[in-house]
């Protein structure tokens, strides 16, 4: 969908990526963000995802594009990351960490894995799904987002995209593997982990999508 493409483009734009940077792409999926980083400048990427299928598809792309020296894939959930301290210049996660229920330990691990001055760049949905599942105010808050996304899904992808978004929307409402928080909450999580500077960038034309850059 157009919104996700633009979201990933904004992540790369505000990341401050430089030549020869070491990057960790969390929740890499089929590699769209990793490949965008490489089109921006020469860098080395470690890409992780909990899905064996996503990693397999991305690995096929890497081999087809002759990028085995530039991208290394690992099948690993964000909660189980085990990298050396001060290893990466940039750690990115786009529409991935809202699947993590207990976010603080993951953010602290990200902080520890970054070099001094390194950046954590997160692209996410600005939606707060915390609270009691049966709380009316919480439900209305989530529906404000879902109404726009359902319309956008139908417009950009037709009935099939609408059905996928409808099913996903129920997961957001019930916190069924989806645990979104708002960007004020993301900012607090980053500051509590030790990040010195936190900036949030809106995605023009898509009020629910934003990008946060936290600098160590």
What are these regions (language model features)?
Residues 24-26, 30-80:
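Class I SAM-dependent methyltransferase SAM/SAH-binding core
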Residues 95-96:
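Short catalytic micro-motifs in class I SAM-dependent methyltransferases
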Residues 125-191, 199-200:
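C-terminal alpha-helical "lid/dimerization" subdomain adjacent to the S-adenosyl-L-methionine
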Residues 92:
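A conserved beta-strand element that flanks and buttresses the S-adenosyl-L-methionine
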Residues 118-124:
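Conserved beta-strand signature within the Rossmann-like core of class I S-adenosyl-L-methionine
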Residues 2-19:
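Conserved alpha-helix/loop element of class I SAM-dependent methyltransferases that forms part
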Residues 193-216:
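Core SAM-dependent methyltransferase catalytic element
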Residues 104-116:
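A short glycine-rich, Lys/Arg-flanked "PGG" loop and its adjoining helix->strand segment in the class I
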């Amino acid at each position: 969908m157009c919104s996700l493409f633009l979201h990933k483009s904004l992540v790369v734009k505000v990341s401050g990526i430089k030549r020869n940077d070491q990057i960790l792409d969390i929740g890499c999926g089929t590699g769209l963000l990793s490949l965008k980083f490489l089109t921006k400048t020469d860098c080395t990427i470690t890409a992780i995802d909990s899905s064996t299928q996503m990693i397999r598809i991305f690995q096929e792309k890497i081999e087809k594009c002759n990028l085995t020296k530039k991208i290394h894939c690992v099948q690993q959930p964000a909660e189980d990351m085990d990298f050396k301290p001060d290893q990466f210049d940039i750690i990115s996660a786009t529409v991935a960490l809202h699947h993590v229920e207990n976010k603080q330990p993951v953010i602290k691990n990200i902080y520890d894995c970054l070099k001094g001055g390194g950046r954590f760049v997160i692209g996410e949905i600005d939606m707060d799904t915390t609270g009691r599942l049966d709380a009316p105010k919480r439900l209305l808050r989530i529906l404000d987002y879902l109404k726009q996304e359902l319309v956008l899904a139908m417009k950009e992808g037709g009935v099939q995209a609408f059905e996928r978004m409808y099913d996903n929307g129920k997961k957001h409402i019930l916190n069924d593997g989806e645990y979104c928080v708002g960007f004020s909450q993301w900012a607090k999580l980053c500051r509590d982990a030790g990040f010195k500077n936190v900036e949030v960038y809106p995605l023009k034309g898509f009020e629910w999508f934003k990008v946060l850059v936290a600098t160590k």
